[in-house]
């Protein structure tokens, strides 16, 4: 698009830009423009500005052109209605309100509008993250009249909401893209910002077309209402693109002065003096997303306030642009060369541009990409890549620069809700950004060698002492010495060096060897203890066996003695039993008469003897049975005692 001449008053201007919309905005990670289908409005000269179709928000007429709301899309896509400037019945006046905290509600906006005298607010729609539903910090409002639109443009930036001054702009795709990029970017400035600017000063603002992405200046020759394309890589992340450049008519050649020149604005004093600083953005209560609190101050702007400048533009060269209705805003630092009027500014940064830190109302879990270099503080811009004001926006009043916001979310907004812990409104933003104070200064060669020699001494002495302690059997002392030396070397300033890593590895090898030796010694001592215990067990078992054998022998002897005594008693009883009949027989013979007695007398004499025999025999048997029972009980008791003694010995 750099070498294409555009007809500013063509009705089919959208055909020229239809093929460029996806190329320009599709790579920014913003997929909210798929439903854009409405034709763009023809740009008007003078006070009427031509808007571009916007997505996810509202149509952007330069002077409150009506926009028709389409309910399609996740956030509600707004299309611009083509037509003339004549009012219609369905006419809606819409504006973007940005730089809001994530906890700002539609009621807060309604109250602020009521305070400035606007009572015909129709709708407030916030832009939210699709992943967690959190507010992105900007919204689109619909008003009922053009007078209310003008009042909001002029007075709402002076009205703070939750400690931040809102930014009001006409709805356009460029403003929407800028709001989206500001809540996605997070620049991380290096510790020292003393480098030169990143490009030469642009030779002229009104010349012919320049190559796409040239770092020295913008492309000239584009229409006033549409900035040149293909310059996403040369714009600072925190800078806005002007929205309504059609209010600056082009008169004269490239080197001629701009028409309708206004007197320059007078400076209001430097930041270091006692006077008020020049009105610039961002404010103290509402820092722009991307500015980190506590950063370095910019250089004192001793010259007159200046307009937004390009990357690498010169300092101290103000631009006296027209002061139309869209230019009623405070100046900012940085500027263009005064050779010609600003005929076009580059668009917002593309996907390759530097990224910035999230604002307090942005969830940082979605934006962890590393940041690029920020703007030089001496170039006049806000520190750490903070954006300058956009010419299509009304800026807040004069406020300080380096104060952190002292406002937080109200109690009803739980910062640890179901959508994750939100970041606090002030302080250092979370993320994998190293602290410059923790990085440490670079060591000189002399300091490096001194630290390395100290580490070598520590390593050699630790190894020698550990080896001597290990040889003496003091393994715990040797291990402690090596561990201490390893920790000391790792904490030194040159621990990342390869030579230092070699020292650490040698110490670790020595430590592993000593630990292995200490483990082997413990195992040997344990094995000796085990062998001693097993020997004791064997001796104990042999002694038990001997005792048991002796007890068995004693038991056998007792049994033999018992058996011998019982046998003798039995033999005696048998002898008595044999002798008893003979005795009875002899008695009977001596008593018996010569005559054979009568049978009755004989039976009476024999009956007592036989009865006595059986009684004696029964008595002997019972006594023998009792004796055997006693011996059996005694043997059982002896066996029980023996078992008890065995159990007691086995336990001990």
Swiss-Prot record:
Gene Ontology MF, one: mRNA binding
Compositionally biased tracts (Gly residues): 205-223
Residue segments, region Disordered: 20-85, 184-440, 518-652
Basic residues bias spans: 529-538
Record field: compositional bias (Low complexity): 391-406, 598-610
One Gene Ontology term, aspect cellular component: nucleus
Taxonomy, superkingdom: Eukaryota
Pro residues composition-biased segments: 187-203, 256-266, 295-307, 338-352, 420-435
UniProt modified residues of type Phosphoserine: 596
Disulfide bonds: none
Major place of residence: nucleus
Protein name: Cleavage and polyadenylation specificity factor subunit 6
């Amino acid at each position: 698009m750099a070498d294409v001449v555009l007809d500013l008053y063509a009705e089919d201007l959208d055909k020229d830009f239809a093929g460029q919309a996806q190329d320009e905005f599709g790579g920014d990670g913003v997929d909210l423009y798929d439903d854009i289908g409405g034709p763009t409005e023809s740009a008007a000269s003078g006070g009427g500005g031509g808007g571009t179709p916007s997505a996810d928000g509202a149509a952007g007429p330069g002077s409150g052109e009506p926009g028709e709301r389409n309910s399609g899309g996740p956030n509600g896509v707004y299309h611009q209605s083509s037509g003339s400037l004549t009012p219609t019945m369905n006419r809606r006046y819409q504006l973007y309100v940005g730089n809001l905290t994530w906890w700002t509600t539609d009621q807060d906006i309604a109250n602020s509008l009521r305070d400035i005298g606007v009572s015909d607010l129709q709708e407030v729609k916030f832009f939210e993250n699709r992943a967690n539903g959190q507010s992105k910090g900007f919204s689109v409002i619909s008003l009922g009249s053009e007078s209310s639109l003008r009042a909001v443009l002029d007075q709402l930036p002076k009205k703070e909401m939750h400690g931040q001054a809102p930014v009001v702009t006409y709805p356009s795709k460029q403003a929407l893209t800028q709001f989206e990029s500001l809540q996605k970017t997070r620049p991380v400035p290096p510790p020292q910002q003393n480098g030169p600017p990143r490009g030469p000063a642009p030779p002229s603002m009104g010349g012919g077309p320049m190559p796409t992405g040239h770092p020295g200046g913008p492309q000239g020759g584009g229409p006033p209402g549409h900035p040149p394309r293909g310059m996403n890589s040369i714009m600072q992340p925190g800078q806005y693109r002007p929205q309504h450049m059609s209010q600056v008519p082009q008169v004269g050649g490239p080197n001629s002065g701009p028409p309708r020149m206004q007197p320059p604005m007078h400076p209001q004093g430097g930041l270091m003096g006692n006077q008020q600083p020049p009105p610039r953005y961002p404010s103290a209560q509402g820092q722009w997303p991307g500015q980190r609190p506590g950063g370095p101050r910019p250089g004192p702007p001793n010259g007159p306030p200046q307009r937004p400048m390009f990357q690498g533009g010169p300092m101290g060269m103000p631009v006296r642009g027209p002061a139309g209705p869209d230019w009623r805003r405070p100046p900012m630092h940085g500027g263009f060369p005064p050779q010609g009027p600003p005929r076009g500014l580059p668009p917002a940064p593309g996907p390759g541009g530097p990224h910035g830190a999230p604002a307090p109302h942005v969830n940082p879990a979605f934006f962890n990409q590393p940041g690029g270099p920020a703007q030089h503080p001496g170039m006049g811009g806000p520190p750490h890549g903070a954006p300058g004001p956009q010419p299509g926006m009304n800026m807040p009043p004069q406020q300080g620069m380096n104060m952190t916001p002292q406002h937080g979310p109200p109690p009803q907004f739980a910062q640890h809700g179901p959508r994750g812990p939100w970041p606090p409104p002030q302080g250092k933003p979370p993320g994998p950004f190293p602290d410059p104070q923790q990085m440490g200064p670079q060591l000189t060669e002399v300091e490096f060698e001194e630290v390395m020699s100290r580490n070598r001494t520590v390593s050699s002495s630790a190894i020698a002492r550990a080896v001597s302690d290990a040889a003496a059997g003091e393994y715990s002392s040797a291990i402690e010495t090596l561990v201490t030396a390893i920790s000391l070397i790792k904490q030194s300033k040159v621990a990342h060096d390869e030579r230092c890593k070699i020292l650490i590895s040698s110490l670790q090898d020595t430590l592993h060897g000593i630990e292995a030796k200490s483990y082997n010694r413990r195992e040997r001592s344990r094995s000796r203890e085990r062998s001693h215990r097993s020997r004791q067990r064997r001796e104990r078992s042999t002694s038990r066996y001997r005792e048991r054998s002796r007890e068995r022998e004693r038991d056998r002897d007792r049994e033999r003695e018992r058996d011998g005594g019982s046998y003798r008693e039995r033999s005696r009883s048998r002898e008595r039993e044999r002798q008893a009949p003979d005795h009875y027989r002899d008695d009977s013979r001596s008593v018996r008469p010569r005559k054979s007695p009568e049978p009755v007398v004989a039976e009476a004499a024999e009956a007592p003897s036989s009865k006595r025999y059986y009684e004696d025999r029964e008595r002997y048997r019972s006594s023998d049975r009792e004796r055997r029972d006693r011996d059996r009980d005694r043997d059982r008791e002896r066996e029980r005692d023996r078992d008890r003694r065995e159990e007691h010995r086995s336990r001990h």
